[in-house]
Amino acid sequence: MDNSNWTSVSHFVLLGISTHPEEQIPLFLVFSLMYAINISGNLAIITLILSAPRLHIPMYIFLSNLALTDICFTSTTVPKMLQIIFSPTKVISYTGCLAQTYFFICFAVMENFILAVMAYDRYIAICHPFHYTMILTRMLCVKMVVMCHALSHLHAMLHTFLIGQLIFCADNRIPHFFCDLYALMKISCTSTYLNTLMIHTEGAVVISGALAFITASYACIILVVLRIPSAKGRWKTFSTCGSHLTVVAIFYGTLSWVYFRPLSSYSVTKGRIITVVYTVVTPMLNPFIYSLRNGDVKGGFMKWMSRMQTFFFR
């Protein structure tokens, strides 16, 4: 491409999910509702865990961190998407775009690490139940959460720095509802070889490493569960992992489909749809998945609601 067509852009134009005017109001209403459910549901999980002393154990400490990550993850993209739906310009500044990319990557990877830590918690609880409190001490839990945050920020810094090295053409329209890595790479005038290489190597190690750790944890859990003599006992033990497995399947399935494939085969339209699933739908469903399948959370929630009812209607 002729170098005269290259430019240092000051802003990008986010085209959003749809360019059809008649779809804008329904999209705004649907995503506003999902965002409200996500924020309220995850805040309820955090508040419940903080207010119930019996839930101050590693499993629920990690769950509250997952809920906080989900709030931040969705808040990185949805408010801006709702704004541009009715904006005549649909503009995001260059700096704002890089910041959005940074925090999106950071919270996506943080969720990845927290899901791996939660799998380790289930492994210790089922495979070493008598040593659970000795192994998963409060200090170890804090260290693991801090490590999740630190590694997530380092990962985000690397990929955001590489995006910042790209040069963009005069056409600065991003066919997406946020500054997604692949969408930005698609409109770059310069080679994205290093970006793609890092996604498929360092990125793959981060994501696949966590997924392999989760798989190994559940392989050990299954071996222990199979030794339980009664079918009822096996089901009761393994059912404690059902919520986590559901979230893992949705999160890694959609994430792998979007990012771990050649850039040439990346479909913007399909990418937008799949991205909505793991950036909006999954964080919205997580509180319901964990609360509906968890007796402690359901019991704590009912007690919390009872206290609220007594407080407001006494």
Swiss-Prot record:
Extracellular side, ranges: 1-25, 80-100, 159-195, 260-272
Glycan attachment points: N5
MF terms in GO:
G protein-coupled receptor activity; olfactory receptor activity
- Where does this one sit in the cell? Cell membrane
Where's it mainly located?
membrane
Q: Determine the domain of life of the protein's source.
A: Eukaryota
Instruction: Give the transmembrane ranges.
Output: 26-49, 58-79, 101-120, 140-158, 196-219, 237-259, 273-292
Which residue pairs form cystines in this protein? C97-C189
Alphabetically sorted, this entry's keywords are: Cell membrane, Disulfide bond, G-protein coupled receptor, Glycoprotein, Membrane, Olfaction, Receptor, Sensory transduction, Transducer, Transmembrane, Transmembrane helix
A single Gene Ontology biological process assigned to it is:
signal transduction
- What does the entry list under GO cellular component? membrane; plasma membrane
Gene3D superfamilies on file: Rhodopsin 7-helix transmembrane proteins (1.20.1070.10)
The UniProt entry lists membrane topology as:
Multi-pass membrane protein
What PROSITE patterns does the record point to?
A: G_PROTEIN_RECEP_F1_1 (PS00237), G_PROTEIN_RECEP_F1_2 (PS50262)
Which ranges sit in the Cytoplasmic compartment?
A: 50-57, 121-139, 220-236, 293-314
Similarity section? Belongs to the G-protein coupled receptor 1 family.
Q: What does this protein do?
A: Odorant receptor.
PANTHER family assigned to the protein according to its UniProt record, in alphabetical order:
OLFACTORY RECEPTOR
What is the protein's name according to its record?
Olfactory receptor 1Q1
Whose protein is this, by species?
A: Homo sapiens
